[in-house]
Design a protein with these regions (language model features):
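Catalytic phosphate/metal-binding cores of nucleic-acid and nucleotide-processing enzymes, i.e., regions
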Residues: 1-128
Length: 128
């Protein structure tokens, strides 16, 4: 019996729930901005006028004063041309964007982000 391949939304939901449950200190700092799906022309124009931008990564994670983007894809999924363009804009502005294909890959990147912030030297002014 073969298992059905996991969809992008299933991978994303598993990753988000893992972070939410494993690292409660990140709650409110990891979120999804709905910017995809099918809409009628009027709703699409309203969303675009209010700031919805195609190609934004699926998950935005804020930590230690930095932003990170996570784009979820299946094993055979590809980044669209508009996603590639937005990812390059973010990266050229110092915002890393990771394309992840599993919850485990997401966990790895989050672990790296959290541990690098934890190992950062304290540069705050004490006693000034």
């Amino acid at each position: 019996m073969t298992t059905k391949p996991r969809s992008e939304i299933q991978i994303q939901a598993e990753a988000y729930q893992w972070l939410h449950n494993t690292h409660p200190e990140t709650r409110g700092l990891c979120f999804h901005v709905p910017n995809g799906g099918s809409r009628n022309a009027i709703e699409g124009m309203q969303l675009k006028a209010s700031g919805v931008v195609a190609g934004i990564p699926d998950i935005i994670f804020l930590w230690d004063g930095k932003a990170y983007g996570f784009e979820f894809k299946t094993a055979s999924g590809h980044v669209s041309p508009i996603q590639d363009k937005i990812h390059k804009v973010w990266q050229s502005n110092g915002v890393p964007v990771y394309v992840v294909r599993s919850c485990e890959e997401f966990q790895y990147h989050i672990g790296e982000i959290l541990s690098s912030a934890a190992n950062k030297p304290n540069t705050s002014c004490v006693g000034v």
